[in-house]
Design a protein with these regions (language model features):
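Alpha-helix boundary/capping detector
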Residues: 1, 7, 49, 57-58, ...
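Short capping/connector residues at structural and topological boundaries
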Residues: 6, 37, 48, 77-79, ...
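Membrane-proximal N-terminal amphipathic helix
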Residues: 38-65
Length: 162
C-alpha cells in the first residue's frame, strides 16, 4: 500500500519563514522613510498655507484701506495685524495671529512670537515629529520703524528631523 503525502515538510516551512523575515527586515526601513516623507510633506503644506494666509491677509487689509495695525476678519476669525501682515502669536492665542489665519490644526505646535508687541518671530513644528525642532519652519511678522514697514516672511522648511 502506497502512502500519499500532502502538505509541506518542516524544513520547507522554516525556509519560508526565514525568507519572509529577511524580506520584512529589508522593507521596514522603507516604511519608516515613508512616515518621515509624509511629515515633511505635511510641513511643506503648512508652510504653503501660512504663506498664502499671509498674502491674503495683506491683500484684504490693503484693499479695505485700514491702518496697517488694525485687525481684520478672515473666514470669521479675527486676525491681529502688524504692518499689514498677521502677527506671530504664541500658541495660547492661536486664533488671533498667523496660526489662525492659516487654519492650522493641533497637529502643529507654535513656539515664540510677540503676543503684546509688534513684530516677532515664531516657529511652527509638526507636533508628532521625532525631533520637532528639526521639522519646522519660521514665520517672522512684519516690523514697523517709523513709516517704514519690513514685510513679513516665511522661512524655508527644515525637514531633517521629520
Amino acid at each position: 500500500m502506497k502512502r500519499v503525502h500532502s502538505g509541506f515538510t518542516l524544513i520547507e516551512l522554516i525556509v519560508v519563514i526565514v525568507i519572509l523575515g529577511i524580506l520584512a527586515a529589508t522593507a521596514l526601513p522603507k516604511f519608516m522613510g515613508i512616515q518621515s516623507g509624509a511629515r515633511a510633506s505635511i510641513l511643506t503644506g503648512a508652510r504653503g498655507a501660512v504663506a498664502s494666509a499671509m498674502n491674503i491677509a495683506y491683500a484684504t487689509q490693503s484693499s479695505t484701506n485700514l491702518a496697517s495695525n488694525v485687525g481684520i476678519t478672515l473666514d470669521g476669525i479675527s486676525i491681529a495685524m502688524v504692518g499689514g501682515y498677521p502677527q506671530a502669536w504664541p500658541a495660547a492665542s492661536y486664533l488671533s495671529g498667523i496660526y489662525g489665519a492659516a487654519g492650522l490644526s493641533n497637529d502643529y505646535s507654535i513656539v515664540g512670537g510677540a503676543s503684546a508687541g509688534l513684530g516677532g518671530s515664531t516657529t511652527i513644528t509638526v507636533a508628532n515629529a521625532p525631533t520637532p525642532n528639526s521639522c519646522a519652519f519660521s514665520y517672522t511678522a512684519a516690523s514697523v520703524a517709523g513709516t517704514t514697514v519690513i514685510p513679513a516672511k516665511v522661512g524655508a522648511p527644515i525637514v531633517g528631523g521629520c
